[in-house]
Each structure stands twice: as C-alpha cells, then as structure tokens.
Amino acid sequence: MKTILAVETSCDETAVAIVNSDKQVLAHEILSQAEHKKRGGVIPEIASRAHMEHLSGLIKSAVEKSNLNFCDLNAIAATSGPGLIGGLIVGTMMAKAIAHVAQKPFIAVNHLEAHALVIRLLHEVKFPFLVLLISGGHCQFLIAQDVGKYIKLGETLDDSLGEAFDKVAKMLGLSYPGGPLIEKLAKKGNGARFKLPRAMIKRYGCNFSFSGIKTAVKNLVQELKMSEQDVCDVCASFQECISDILLDRVSNAIIMAESLNIKINDFVITGGVAANNFLREKLKQHINLNIFFPPNDLCTDNAIMVGWTGIERLQKNYIDPLNFAPRPKWELESY
C-alpha cells in the first residue's frame, strides 16, 4: 500500500490531504478564502499570502489526524500548475521541502489531470474515457488514454465556463461566486423567455465560445429595469443556453473519438461547474454513455484529487526532480 501527502494551492483554496492506494482518505484539511467574495473575485497576491499563512498549519493538522508520521509516507505531491503562480510556488516549495527533509519522492501534479482522475478514487472508470472539464479557469474536452496520456479534443476560445457564470452573475448584481446563485434563481425563472446566442453550435469540433452570451446578457441588463423576475428569467435562460451548447459539443466529442478509433464507454464531467445540478440532469438525460460526476466537494478544488493523482502517478513510477518549477500554464497533452 502507498500513502501520499498532497498539497493544493493553485487558486484560492488552501488544502492538504493524505490518501492511500487502498482508496482511503486518511485526512483532508481545506480553507477557502472568504476575502475574495467581498472583492468580487480572486486577488492573486491576497491568495498567495493566505497560502503562506495557513499551509503549514493545515499540514500539521492533516498529519496528526492521520495518525502517521512523515516517515510513513511514500511520496509528497503538490499541484504545480496550471494556476496562479504565487500560490503554485507556495505549495510546490513546501511539498519539495518536506520531500527533501523526509527523503521521499516528489510528484508534481497537473491540476487538470487531478480533476480528470479523481473519479477513479470513487468508481471503476477504465481508460480510455471522455472528460469534460468545466471550471473557473478551464473548459475543455479530453480523452484520457492513461495516466499522463491525454488527447485534447477542444477548449474554450475565450472565457472558461466558470468565468462566464461569474461574469453574468456580476452583471445581474449577484455576488461571487456566481454559479450557485444563478442555479438557485434559475429555479424560479422561465428559461424560454430570452433566446441567448448558442455560439458554435451545429459546427464541427469541440471548441467553445462564451463571449457572445455575456454580451447578450449585458444588453438585456441595459434594456430592462431588471426586476427580480427578470433576473430569475435571465438565469434560467442562461442555463438553458449553456446546456444546449454542452450537449452539442458532447455529441461532437463522441464523433471525434470514433474517428480516432477510440471506443468510449465512460464519460466524466468534472470541475467546479460540474456541481450544477441542472446541467448534470440535462447531460444525464441526453447522453448515451456511462456518465460520472464527482461529488460536489471533489468537483471544486481540493487536495484529495491531488493525492489520488499522486498515487496513480507513483504507481507508474512517475517521479519529479526537486528542481521542478511551477507552471502557471501547463497543457495536459504535454504532461
């Protein structure tokens, strides 16, 4: 059995987990930074300072709760990209320092791979499988062929889907993060009232574009006085628009996989936006694949997914040198 201590500091969550190859989570400590909610978004310098302040305490707490010592660990893992460079430096340097002192291997984890693989901690999802990663920083389709081996089928050409949710929410006068509030208000709205643009729909390929939807919502806000019902109707119409785009792109992704002679049975939807229950139900109803969603606490950033990915990589003997430099941009294809 292998056991890993993992660190996640790529954005505004400071998290530490201890995970083993028997699929047990021995400890998980996470601290979300409420400061960003008051400011309407993540401030990189504030985020990195908070990581510096809290990370060592979370590591100490996780080790104590696991009833292990550093000598009991088989490796130390950290999210080393992509993400905000300040946070990545804090987490990666701390993990490398522990690895050096404890004489343990260091594993640099790609944040995107961690989102893609965490489902295998919970379910018997076999390679190859299709991944739709929809989060605050990323929106892309991947075929996961194996640990460390991916084919990117498409991605956003402008904003990520999470950014689109947050920016639309801000236009409507809602607080950050916008996704949960849009989903809540949409339940009281009429999704057929406003016809928002479905960019790139019915076109070949798996790329996305969400800038036109934002512009359309901005125009609605300027045209209407935006009563409470108007806001609910815009939220519902926005979600209907997003679901139509995702369904169209998923159909194309399946066709593209077939053209590559890759048989896909399992489809994993992951990332923070995958916690949206409306989108989950739409995809379940219309996609003829085995669909898997991580639980909500594993859709958003966490250290459990980093620890599990560390286990998967350790089992392949994928070890990284202590001079590995954090990467704010890190394509999963080249992993």
From Swiss-Prot:
It catalyses: L-threonylcarbamoyladenylate + adenosine(37) in tRNA = N(6)-L-threonylcarbamoyladenosine(37) in tRNA + AMP + H(+). CDD domains: ASKHA_NBD_TsaD_bac. Its cofactor is Fe(2+). Keywords: Acyltransferase, Cytoplasm, Iron, Metal-binding, Transferase, tRNA processing. It comes from the Bacteria. Binds 1 Fe(2+) ion per subunit. Its EC number is 2.3.1.234. GO terms for biological process: tRNA threonylcarbamoyladenosine modification. This is tRNA N6-adenosine threonylcarbamoyltransferase. It comes from Wolbachia sp. subsp. Drosophila simulans (strain wRi).
